[in-house]
Amino acid sequence: IHQEPIYPYILVEHGADISANYDRTIINSSEYGNFEIVKYLIDNGADITAINEYGFTPLDLSSKNGHYEIVKLLVECRASIIKTDNLTLILASENGHIKIVKLLVENGADIRYHNNYSLQLALKEAIVKS
């Protein structure tokens, strides 16, 4: 089991800018499903639109890895669901996370987006996996 260290709490308490650079902490915590750290970071001003070196946001990574509660939190905090490539929805679909797909669609993701063939395949795959 991957666990994030306690350091974000210590850094924030000592005045560190947790949004500096790529904000690896919120990205990694979202990817590995550490809800409490993600919530703490958001409550203390972390950038929910941070992008890692591969172009993924916290919402992308939590959707890809099936971390529903983190996805829900990020959506509630107005993380961008609609991107030019519909990547977040594709990642959730490809990995069979129907509950996350439903949440994303209910909050504005468009499954008909430009007749995106890869999205259609991903949605079919998600249904098969569920």
Swiss-Prot record:
Keywords: ANK repeat, Repeat. PROSITE patterns: ANK_REP_REGION, ANK_REPEAT. This is Putative ankyrin repeat protein R886. Pfam families: Ank, Ank_2. InterPro entries: Ankyrin_rpt, Ankyrin_rpt-contain_sf. It comes from the Viruses. ANK repeats lie at residues 21-50, 54-83, 85-113. Disulfide bonds: none annotated.
